[in-house]
Amino acid sequence: MEKKANFAAYTTNDKVRFTMRKKLLILAACLSATALTAQNTNRTDSVRTQKMDEVVVTHRRQLVRNDIDKLTYDVQHDETAKTKSTLEILKQIPFVSVDGQENIKVQGSSSFKVYKNGHPDPGFSGQNLKEILKALPASNIKKIEVITDPGARYDAEGTTAILNIVMTNDTRLQGVSGNVNLSANTWGSMGAGAYLTTKTGKLTTTVSYNEYYQSAKQSEGGSEAAYHYIESGERSFASQNSSTKYNIHIGDISASYEIDSLNLLSASASGFGYAMDNNAHGTHERRDKDGSLIYHYDRRSYTPEYAYLNFGGRLDYQHKTHLDGEVLTLSYMLAATRRHNTSREEYSNAVNMPVSYTGYDLNSREHFSEHTFQVDYVRPFGKHHKLESGLKYILRHNNSLTFIDYTGTATDVDTHFKHGTQVAAAYLSYLVTAGKWSARTGLRYEYSYMKGEYPDGSNNSFHARLNDWVPSMSLQYKMTDTQSMKISYSTSINRPGITYLNPAVISSPNTRQYGNASLGSSRNQKLQISYMLNARKLTMNLTPYYDFTNNGITDIRYVEGRTIVSTYGNVQKRREAGLLTYTRWQPFRGTTLSMNASAKYARIAVPAPEVVENKGWSGSVFLDYGQKLPWKLHFDTSLALQCGHPIRGPYAYEARWHNYRFTINRSFLNDRLSVAVYANMPFTTREKYRYRTVHGDYTGYNLSWDKTRFFGIRASWSFGKLKASVKKAERSIQNDDLVGGVKK
């Protein structure tokens, strides 16, 4: 039996592997023959031959790469990505966590933005990001970049990190390529999508469309809440059952035209929309400190019409000079959002009803539009120095209409609110490399003018002028080819969105909520150190960090009579220290183990209306085990959990949770067709999530549960030969803005 000798080497495809193996065999044979001839002094008229062992060149591609400003995960070469959704693949990416209810955090924070192909996309914004990423197959994605240190080039507002989803290949290939994917599960939810890339002469286009339907049966769940009101000693209890079904549509078209080797014109348009139907029914009661009934009523709510449409377009012109690396980019972006909500609340079986109405109809419309103009210029100086500079102007308009028609004697609500923002920004960034060292520093200035007005005369108009200087800096040392260390400092700001600003009052029998038109921007600062090891079989990252803010935008809650009142203010003081770690280990061929974990201590304080402080330790971990099996099968299992006391704002603790999944997939037709079957939490009927309110005018808990056990199948088929993909400008528009309300 011949013995195989394995040598690790880096190749790009099977063709290169075969060519290298052939050359190594020839070279080894020649060297062996020469050596044997030199040792044989008696026979010089012949060459002694020896049969060589087969030399197999294998390739272990590193899926994670660390740069001075970002960490990149190679989705395209992750074998498990062919039959996963983008939401599932996020669990495997360093610094990213997805909890049991599919809420996404980056570096432990929900303050992040999602880009597509290097620029903000209207389809990846809003409050339903998890549904969008669930509908998008990972097979359409090349890589995902976690920009942990957004420098001066990125907007100062709205983000401490950026997820950049790169969906097309930037290499010069040629031809036609496409992909079709289908998915379904046992609850009746299903999805379908396709994309196609073509090239005609110098024109390259990419078109994609995805649709996802979630059945009401999958989202069936319930909740209960019990609270104790400290001052009065009264107690309340509420319970409800609910279900939600929705249909999501995501479309995108991109095109580029290479005028010549120095000039490139690219454009794209995208759209995202969904319709939702929600139904809920339950009961609510309140008792005094002696247990006597104060009031009781049953509640039913439904949403006969909820429509959300998000669309946008982008145009970039890129000019390169004959100096290598010098680039000028001119960009324009349009983003628009339309949202229409019609809902109905009904109350029945009432005893001592606390309000003078038995129901109401809510009709709200929100419109958002944004125009962005940007100029970017990059100029290298020698081999080790580079300057980046740019100018940006943003014009935003928000328009909100809210009408509440009460059934009873309560006064109807009719509010019209307009909000406009203008932002002018300039930045300068300097990058230097010297041997194993690299450093980047930058400064950004932003001027913003905000104006709010009430055409109905219900409130006085207001305006604000803000000036913000935002510095950033990073220093990286590459100890070896596989190890590096980085330290960075960054700042960011948050400006309030229309939901946070809109003063319209929305009431229920026991709650009242309204926005705060006087909100200003908040400032966040962060310091972190990152160690990266990228060895042949082991990838590891350790990142301790500390961040803080003194005027964060937060919700303010208090009790007024028997009503819980909530609004917003620039009053949050936050301190957080933590450790992020990622490990990916390939102990032997065909086996992969990975862990994405974090631990942190956080403290939040709110001084108004009374001093409230919330603090606690918490941790989360995602474990994944992948194993290649005979007959081209691949088995994958994952486990995720959250532990400790994760704080939820200044008043409450988040729920602890766990989640697990088993997947088997196989490729057919020369790896063009991939099919996966999976089981999500097969040994758990439903998962419970308990949120505990421990501070403020009332304490208690909110317990919710949903269905977690289901089975599904996914299939992805690739066709054609890709030889050229859409080229994109190396610089483009990024708007990292707004907390709360309708975004792009």
Model-inferred region functions:
Residues 40-79, 99-101, 107-111, 147-149:
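Short, acidic, small-residue-rich periplasmic hinge/interaction motif at the N-terminus
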Residues 616-744:
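Conserved C-terminal beta-signal and adjacent last beta-strands/turns
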Residues 54, 86-89, 129-132, 146, ...:
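N-terminal periplasmic accessory domains that precede
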